[in-house]
Regions:
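Helical "substrate-binding/catalytic lid" subdomain
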Residues: 1-77
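C-terminal active-site/capping subdomain that shapes the small-molecule cofactor and substrate pocket
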Residues: 50-116
Length: 116
């Protein structure tokens, strides 16, 4: 569990930085450091109640845009985004943040190979 949390967090962060560099940001660390710090702090304090963003809101249209944009850069990153999105949707439903019916549209977009 510790390797899962610590090692994959590094992969997630560095992949985020790579995607931002690909989008033209020269120093993405400055942009993401406050956001990631707050996200980690909130996750440790509040658990699933700290979930925010398009998946927790049930915004399937935004998620579809994200999947397409990431797929243009890296199919591996897009697969990871879809997998983490499905896990996030399940956790958001379990935490009462997302209604099951709203999760259905998200899961359609986040299905492996969909959302392109």
């Amino acid at each position: 569990a510790l390797a899962y949390g610590s090692n994959y967090l590094i992969t997630l962060v560095t992949q985020c930085l790579d995607l931002l560099r690909h989008a033209g940001l020269e120093d993405p660390q400055r942009l993401v450091a406050p956001l990631l710090g707050a996200s980690l702090d909130n996750a440790l304090r509040w658990g699933d109640q700290a979930l925010t963003g398009p998946v927790a809101r049930g915004d399937a249209a935004s998620v579809a845009v994200h999947v397409r944009a990431i797929e243009e850069v890296s199919s591996e990153a897009a697969s990871a985004y879809r997998a983490l999105g499905r896990l996030t949707a399940d956790r958001a439903v379990g935490a009462g943040l997302l209604k099951a019916r709203d999760a259905e549209a998200l899961l359609e977009v986040l299905g492996e190979g969909r959302g392109r």
